[in-house]
Amino acid sequence: MKLLHLDASILPEDSSVSRTLSAAVVAHVRALQPDLTVTRRDLVAHPLSHMTLANLPPDHPASVPGNEVERAESQAVLEEFLTADIVVIGAPMYNFTIPTQLKSWLDRVLVPGRTFKYGPEGVKGLVEGKRVIVALSRGSFYGQETPYATAEHTETYLRTALGFIGIATPEVIVAEGVSRGEDQRAAAIEAAHQTVAALRV
């Protein structure tokens, strides 16, 4: 079984909630699945450039010859995603949405003809049988009962993007309010770890 582990926090693991949680998810899955092969992609330590026609994966219909090194890397990112059985994404909320580093990764993964296709009846996702677990951190509270509910564009964006390519039910583990005092931070992290511990393979 292959697992792809992505992190997009600009903070180091000892101070990043999303990195800590994504690492906990990977460790938990590894304990339950000893034959697991893990590929790690740190999107901050090794960022992908923003999307251009010249660095799209060659499989993308809009791709044109350009930076062949980046095109090859983009193709490798796509294949890495497609061959993984499980994808674990560590994603903090930055300014109400996902980090740009994670957006650049998604731009390599949402590829017409490979992960989705258009047809007379609309869009059809082509990614089947893949499990995605998102470890998400938010500094404040963005639930439906809060004044900031409409400002939540991290979980909603990821659910939309993943659903678009056929991953209709990603598992999202949220540590919320982690910037609202030490007690709240500790409680949110503990609750998230309990959710991680309940994951089944």
UniProtKB/Swiss-Prot annotation:
Q: Which Gene3D superfamilies match?
A: 3.40.50.360
Keywords carried by this UniProt record: Flavoprotein, FMN, NAD, Oxidoreductase
Q: Give cofactor(s), names only.
A: FMN
Which residues bind FMN per the record? 9, 16-18, 93-96
Molecular function terms from GO: electron transfer activity; FMN binding; oxidoreductase activity, acting on NAD(P)H as acceptor; oxidoreductase activity, acting on NAD(P)H, quinone or similar compound as acceptor
Q: Look up keyword Nuclease and say if it applies.
A: no
User: What is this enzyme's EC?
Assistant: 1.6.5.-, 1.7.1.17
Oligomeric and partner information: Homodimer.
Q: Which PANTHER family match?
A: FMN-DEPENDENT NADH-AZOREDUCTASE 1, FMN-DEPENDENT NADH:QUINONE OXIDOREDUCTASE
What is the name of the protein in this document?
A: FMN-dependent NADH:quinone oxidoreductase
Protein source organism = Gluconacetobacter diazotrophicus (strain ATCC 49037 / DSM 5601 / CCUG 37298 / CIP 103539 / LMG 7603 / PAl5)
